[in-house]
């Protein structure tokens, strides 16, 4: 049985324009999702960066780059990554009929295989990765950039594949399996980039052939965010443990 009552059929736009994707931030479901990033994810990343500087100090590692270089460089990376996440989240919201944050509205009700999602399955991860690296550069922490960032990337890949995509398979069935086989998770292929530039869908389905939006969300979808919170706490604990070991 589903965790929620049947969903109203959303008005979907399969290929939303760029401006509409950015304007979608005015939707409560979308800006609440961004609030989680600002008030939960960003502070957690700041704590990890601080732990990285403590490990640097314990190991005698100097800060990377002069402050006059790393601050504008890092801010530029954070801004670029943030704009990319803003765009792809807006695209998913308009084309998929739901927020990327399942804790807000249960998530998309239609599978999206156009725009940036015809190129890779999780385009927002690239923007987040760019922002996290930029944050580490601002802090100047070698430990954060060399050790923490790869761990965060692995964590993201694992949770996307075995948590987020599990719900996508339950929600969209065999179509998502075909989509996953055709579209890589994070590293775009030339064919995917070409599809994006030509504004082609990954599954090459005509609009008239698309199935209707799903009528309900998979059981357990509302608890997905709790897994991410537990993961963040465990990661911070791991990095704090490394600091304790080397201090």
Protein language model annotation of sequence segments:
Residues 122-125, 175:
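An acidic site on a long C-lobe helix of protein kinase domains
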């Amino acid at each position: 049985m589903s965790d929620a009552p049947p969903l109203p059929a959303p008005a979907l736009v399969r290929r939303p324009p760029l401006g509409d994707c950015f304007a979608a931030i005015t939707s409560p479901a979308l800006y609440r999702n961004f609030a989680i990033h600002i008030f939960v994810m960003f502070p957690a990343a700041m704590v990890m960066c601080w732990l990285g500087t403590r490990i640097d100090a314990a190991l005698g590692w100097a800060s990377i780059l002069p402050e006059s270089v790393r601050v504008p460089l890092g801010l530029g990376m954070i801004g670029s990554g943030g704009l990319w996440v803003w765009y792809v989240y807006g695209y998913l919201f308009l084309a998929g009929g739901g927020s990327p944050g399942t804790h807000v509205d249960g998530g998309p009700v239609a599978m999206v295989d156009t725009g940036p999602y015809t190129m890779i399955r999780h385009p927002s991860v690239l923007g987040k990765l760019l922002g996290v690296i930029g944050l580490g550069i601002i802090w100047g922490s070698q430990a954060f950039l060399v050790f923490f960032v790869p761990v965060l990337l692995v964590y993201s890949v694992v949770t996307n594949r075995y948590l987020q995509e599990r719900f996508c398979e339950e929600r969209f069935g065999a179509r998502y399996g075909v989509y996953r086989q055709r579209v890589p998770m994070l590293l775009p292929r030339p064919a995917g980039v070409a599809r994006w530039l030509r504004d082609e869908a990954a599954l090459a389905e005509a609009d008239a052939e698309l199935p209707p939006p799903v009528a309900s969300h998979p059981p357990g979808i509302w608890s997905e965010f709790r897994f991410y919170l537990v993961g963040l706490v465990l990661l911070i604990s791991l990095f704090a443990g490394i600091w304790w070991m080397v201090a």
